[in-house]
């Protein structure tokens, strides 16, 4: 039930943040906290991420759930600009002192027919690390494991990719199963690395 309510929030934000520009990706942090617990945080933080190609902001996406996993609260970030996009690869870098669990942080990917799928952090395929103290993970047609939210199967990226309706990063595992927070950088959509709130692709 928690994801059903959160998915409605994500859908609303996708319609706001995509603007119909296929060449612009936006990562919009938010929190789902209907009970007012105050334990979830989602924000971009400067000087905490990996070095940027341009500028010195070096931002990272901070997601936190400072309480039990059972609490009806989630930190998330909606990826704008993906509605109707054919995706062939997903991934991100995470700082090693943060939490990487089966369910958080994760990509929630919704297809146009309403089916949605979970890409949990520990099920991504580790790559060569981008820097000391960081881990890079990927999902594509040959790497990573994807789990369906219902009685259906992930269609696979395939040779030509899969069309999506929305993508969000969700963090809803609390301090009872890990550290309760993570720093993410270089969010990967089809090879485009997003390390700040808005990125224009080539």
Where are these regions (language model features)?
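Positively charged n-region of N-terminal signal peptides that target proteins for export
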Residues: 1-4
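Bacterial N-terminal signal peptides
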Residues: 7-17
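Extracellular carbohydrate-recognition regions
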Residues: 21-46, 195-202
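Short carbohydrate-recognition loop motifs
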Residues: 47-74
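Short, flexible beta-strand-to-coil junctions
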Residues: 65-69, 111-114, 170-177
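Short linear interaction motifs
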Residues: 69-76, 88, 181
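Extracellular ligand-binding interfaces
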Residues: 80-82, 86-88, 94-157
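Extracellular beta-strand ligand-recognition surfaces/modules
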Residues: 104-107, 131-200
């Amino acid at each position: 039930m928690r994801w059903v309510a959160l998915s409605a929030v994500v859908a609303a934000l996708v319609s706001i943040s995509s603007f119909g520009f296929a060449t612009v990706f936006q990562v919009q942090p938010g929190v789902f906290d209907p009970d007012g617990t105050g334990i979830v945080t989602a924000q971009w933080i400067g000087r905490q991420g990996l070095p940027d190609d341009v500028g010195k902001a070096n931002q990272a996406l901070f997601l936190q759930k400072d309480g039990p996993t059972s609490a009806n609260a989630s930190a998330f970030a909606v990826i704008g600009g993906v509605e109707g996009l054919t995706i062939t690869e997903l991934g991100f870098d995470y700082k090693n002192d943060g939490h990487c669990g089966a369910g958080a942080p994760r990509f929630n990917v919704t297809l146009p027919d309403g089916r949605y799928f979970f890409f949990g952090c520990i099920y991504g395929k580790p790559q060569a690390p981008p820097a000391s103290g960081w881990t890079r993970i990927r999902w594509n047609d040959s790497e990573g494991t994807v789990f369906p939210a219902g009685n259906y199967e992930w269609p696979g990226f395939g040779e030509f990719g899969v069309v999506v309706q929305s993508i969000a990063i969700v963090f809803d595992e609390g301090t009872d199963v890990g550290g309760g927070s993570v720093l993410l950088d270089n969010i990967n959509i089809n090879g485009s690395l997003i390390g700040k709130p808005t990125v224009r692709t080539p």
